[in-house]
Amino acid sequence: MYAVVVTGGKQYKVTEGDVLFVEKLDAEVDAAIELDNVLAISKDNGEFVVGKPVVEGAKVTAKVLKQGKAKKVVVFKYKPKKHYRKKQGHRQPYTKIQIEKINA
């Protein structure tokens, strides 16, 4: 059984036990969260349900494992012959979650 869920503006295909890195969620570590934007579900009997736009009554339960920041990305801008140099770094915050249960 798998589901397609939306969180942080991105879509993820998840099964029970999967570990994901998603955009930062406002939740404490070891907290249980519910992802209720389920676009599609594939059941064990081969049935495939597609929502319009979401599947009614479906939700995915997950556990927050970690809050953190990704590796630094360096942004370097320059203009040739003008002595313009600008170096900037960015670290995107993320939440590491583990999918516990898919309710269809």
From Swiss-Prot:
Q: Does the keyword 4Fe-4S apply?
A: no
Query: Which of UniProt's keywords are assigned here?
Result: Ribonucleoprotein, Ribosomal protein, RNA-binding, rRNA-binding
Q: Which Pfam families does this one have?
A: Ribosomal_L21p
Segments spanning the bilayer are none
Q: Name one GO biological process term.
A: translation
Give the signal peptide range. none
Q: Which GO terms describe its molecular function?
A: rRNA binding; structural constituent of ribosome
Q: Which SUPFAM superfamilies match?
A: L21p-like (SSF141091)
The GO cellular component terms are:
cytoplasm; ribonucleoprotein complex; ribosome
Keyword Transferase attached: no
Main role?
Answer: This protein binds to 23S rRNA in the presence of protein L20.
Q: Which family does it belong to?
A: Belongs to the bacterial ribosomal protein bL21 family.
Q: Which HAMAP family match?
A: Ribosomal_bL21
PANTHER family per the record? 50S RIBOSOMAL PROTEIN L21 (PTHR21349), LARGE RIBOSOMAL SUBUNIT PROTEIN BL21M (PTHR21349:SF0)
The subunit field of the Swiss-Prot or TrEMBL record says: Part of the 50S ribosomal subunit. Contacts protein L20.
Q: What is this protein called?
A: Large ribosomal subunit protein bL21
